[in-house]
């Protein structure tokens, strides 16, 4: 029997962006490797076939049973999804081990081909982040960054500290589904599926604020201006446009933001200018809720890359997002499928511009279709993962570190 591919990550039903990412990535990695099982070693709340829920970071030595399970399964490769909070042990004093347990795990499985996919790599690294990436990159065969700027900024960050730059970094973009494009007729049906056809005042055209409600997702920037924007659009085009705000909260720390944003939307709803739709942003309903919108606004104030944006791209939906904002800005420039704003006035202008210009929306949608088909489709990304796996296996076999060219 062929050796399995092992993913290490949080996993559903946990309401976590990395868990959702892993679930989707696993699907397409499995399609690319039908001869192998793709298994997951997850935290203790992970569930499902082929999932081993054994990561318990309440124990300092959580990594030991994980290393034992990896060796027991004898994998083709280990693929680790990384976010600092996922592998963080907190001692009885409330002190973090700063992912030391994860570094111990990498040393314990150094005989196994391993790649790691960090989901937070800032353009300007903190001392802690730089130290972790330095140590991690020396214990791993291949490091997978999401964006090209992260790789060339890493060189700048490390040279500024007089450190050697890791040469085993490969750029593999955040995957987006190639099978979630809907026709206009299907969008009408989706409104019915979601029950939106029963909202009497809901306009035929919708601007979407969709996804997890968090303090960094500043819905209030748009909601505070929406009444004026909607009137301006109507005066110019004679068309009615509404704001569709949809999602829910998952982090108790963000519940006050949820309450505030929702109350602002409900005030607009009383004026028949908006509608709030509560749902858990994962699975098909996430795509369907975005699909009924003409375009999406993603007003994020802190994000390196975005699962929400990946879904926007999958649907070929024009969008507006904040800049400069790490991967959001990079993918907007690369795709030509979105507009960027740095001020409230820019956001107002862009929303009105997109609502009044169907030709621009169609052009940006075509740009996103091309970007999806040629760059970020999960089918393409899964093949790039396969290339990384081969590099990791060859490095483990020969003992020669992977060395890839710099961006610049």
Task: Locate predicted features.
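Nucleotide-activated donor-binding/catalytic signature segment of Leloir-type glycosyltransferases, i.e.
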Residues: 247-249, 256-284, 335
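Conserved acidic donor-binding segment of nucleotide-sugar-dependent glycosyltransferases
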Residues: 334-345, 353-359
């Amino acid at each position: 029997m062929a050796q399995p591919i092992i993913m290490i990550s949080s996993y559903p039903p946990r309401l976590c962006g990395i868990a959702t990412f892993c679930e989707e990535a696993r699907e397409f990695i499995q399609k690319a490797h039908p001869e192998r099982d793709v298994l997951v070693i997850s935290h203790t709340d992970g569930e499902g076939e082929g999932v081993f829920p054994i990561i318990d970071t309440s124990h300092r030595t959580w990594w030991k049973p994980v290393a034992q399970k990896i060796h027991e399964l004898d994998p083709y490769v280990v693929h680790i999804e990384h976010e600092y909070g996922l592998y963080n042990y907190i001692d009885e004093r409330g002190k973090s081990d700063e992912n030391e347990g994860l570094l111990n795990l990498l040393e314990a499985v150094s005989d196994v081909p391993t790649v790691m996919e960090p989901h937070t790599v800032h353009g300007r690294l903190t001392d802690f982040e730089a130290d972790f990436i330095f140590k991690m990159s020396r214990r791993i065969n291949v490091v997978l960054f999401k964006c090209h700027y992260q790789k060339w900024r890493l060189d700048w960050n490390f040279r500024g500290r007089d450190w050697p730059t890791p040469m085993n970094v490969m750029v593999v973009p955040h995957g987006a589904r190639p099978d979630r494009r809907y026709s206009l007729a299907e969008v009408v049906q989706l409104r019915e599926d979601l029950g939106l056809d029963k909202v009497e005042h809901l306009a035929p055209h919708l601007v979407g604020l969709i996804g997890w409600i968090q303090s960094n997702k500043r819905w209030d920037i748009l909601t505070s201006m929406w009444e004026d924007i909607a009137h301006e659009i109507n005066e110019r085009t004679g068309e009615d446009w509404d704001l569709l705000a949809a999602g829910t909260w998952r982090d108790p720390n963000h519940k006050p933001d949820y309450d505030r944003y929702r109350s602002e939307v409900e005030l607009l709803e009383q004026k028949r200018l908006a509608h709030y739709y509560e749902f858990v942003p994962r699975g098909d309903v996430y795509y369907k809720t975005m699909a009924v919108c003409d375009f999406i606004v993603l007003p994020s104030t802190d994000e390196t890359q975005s699962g929400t944006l990946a879904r926007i791209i999958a649907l070929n939906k024009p969008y507006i997002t904040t800049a400069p904002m790490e991967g959001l800005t990079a993918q907007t420039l690369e795709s030509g499928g979105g507009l960027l704003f740095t001020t409230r006035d820019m956001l107002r202008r862009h929303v009105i511009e997109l609502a009044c210009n169907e030709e621009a929306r169609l052009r940006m949608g075509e740009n996103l279709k091309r970007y999806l088909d040629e760059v970020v489709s999960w089918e393409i990304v899964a093949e790039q993962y396969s290339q990384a796996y081969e590099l990791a296996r060859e490095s483990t076999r020969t003992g020669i570190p992977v060395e890839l060219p710099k961006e610049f």
